[in-house]
Every structure is written in C-alpha cells, then in structure tokens.
Amino acid sequence: MRIKNFKFRNVFFCCFFLLISMFSFGQSKKTDEIILTDDGVILNLKGTFKINWDKSDPDVPCSSIGYGRMMFYPENKDIAHNKIIVLMPNDFTFYNQDMNWDYEKEFAENEKAKIEILKKIFPEEVKKMEKIQKGELQSPARVKIKKVTPYTECDFTTVYAQVIELKKIEGAKPKITKLKVKKLDESDDFDDPNPDEFGYLEEYRVNAKDGYANMREKPTTDSKIISKLDNEIIVRYITKYGDWYYVYYADYPSDYKNDPTVKEYRGFIHKSQLEKRVY
C-alpha cells in the first residue's frame, strides 16, 4: 500500500512541477519580449521581415534598391494588436516638426540608412535584389525596437518604431520573389495588406476609482510616474507585461496658437484602471 502511495505522490509531484514549468515558460517568453531600461522600453521580437522594391517606378532614384518600407510582422499576435510594424532606420517624429525641417534631406538619409541595414543583414540577397527591377524580400528575423508610435491618417492607423537591431533567424533562408513590371496604366501587384493590419489600433479608456490613472515608467507600483491620465482619456495598446499594459498616448494641445506642442507618452498602466473601448 505504501509503495502505491509513494508512486502516486511521485506522479502527482512530477505533473505539478511540469505544469508550473510550462506556466513559467509561457510567462517568461512574453516578458522576455520587453526589455526595461532607464531610457525607455525596448521590444525584442521574433517574426517576419519584409521589404519590396520597384526600380521601374520613375520616382525611384537609380541608386535606390528599395522604395517600399521595411515591415515587420511579429510572431506574437498580441503585439500592437496584430498590426504590421513599420521599421524606421533613424529617429523620427510625426509631431512638432522644426520650421526648417528638410523633408527631402531626411528621406535621403533614411533611404541611405535603410540600404546600409539591408547590406549588413542580407549581403547576398542584396546582390540579387540589385539585378531585379521589382520584387520582394521576406525573411524570418528578430528585431529590437523602441519608440513604438501608432499614427493615424484618415481611417488608417500604422504602427511605426525605430529599429535598433535586426537579425536573421539562424538557419532560416530568406526568400526573394521577382514580380512582374507592369505598364503605367496597370495596377500594382504587390500583395495588398490585410485592412485590419493598418486599421484602428486597440484602444482603452482610463477608468480608475480615483478618477485618474498613473502611467508609470516600469510595470511596478513604485516606479516613476510619467503622467497622470484622467478618466475618459483614450490610450493605445502596444503590449502587456503581466497585469500591466504598455500603452501610448498623444496629448494634443487645447490652444494651438499659443502652444502647438504635442506631447507623447509611453508607459505602463495597470489593467484594472483601463476598460476596452468599444466602437
């Protein structure tokens, strides 16, 4: 009888520890995607990198290998509510532009930085891309990004982020697809993205018992407060860290004439102080 009980206890404890290990692995896998630094949050993501180019387009300089954006599709569908992330090679902003801002210069600098990234990460593929007028490169990859920014124009929200590291997944083989060059009166044949991938981002309304919620630098109650957000303020979801939501908020000025500055905030709010916005 004791032997049977002993075996039963062994089986029970083995199953118990297996469940704990599986739970811990799942938790660590998600939290490993968020790197907390004193300079802000860095997301370390695995997924698919994609870029297309069209040198038959008359607006594309001959020296430019790509005209499309560097896009990243996170493996974790929870990131930015399963939206495509457009990778920006340099620091960027959509607000508070300097009066002397030179769009053409910035565009040229970004194109140059983009090509440098491609040549560094995909040296062999770039050689092939240079011989193809129109095509698409796709590869499993891992990225580290910061300054995640959901930006809405008209009815579409695009998620942008500054890429600070891009790596091919070891052993993975990038794929280059050659596309047909169409006549000027024909439509483009790049794959149209799913409208949901560029649609409205998941949003939450602040709904705290105290009438406001603290947006914190890190997902702890003793972390530095970045901003106090009143109830009814809408924030945009990026990802979560346990019971804390990492969100984005753009504070537009009430008096543009005297102070046109838009203030951007990214930080953590406990999920108990938020409610999902329903359209």
In which residue ranges do the predicted regions lie?
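Bacterial Sec-dependent N-terminal signal peptides
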Residues: 1-30
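Structural detector for short beta-strands of small beta-barrel domains
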Residues: 32-84, 89-90, 143
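Flexible glycine-rich surface loops and low-complexity tracts that mediate binding to linear polymers
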Residues: 47-51, 117-154, 237
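SH3/SH3-like beta-barrel fold
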Residues: 72, 232, 245-250
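Beta-strand/loop nucleic-acid-binding surfaces
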Residues: 79-131
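OB-fold/S1-family single-stranded nucleic acid-binding modules
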Residues: 149-183
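Boundary regions of SH3-family modules and the immediately adjacent low-complexity/disordered segments
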Residues: 177-200, 224, 248-279
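Beta-loop motif signature
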Residues: 192-243, 277
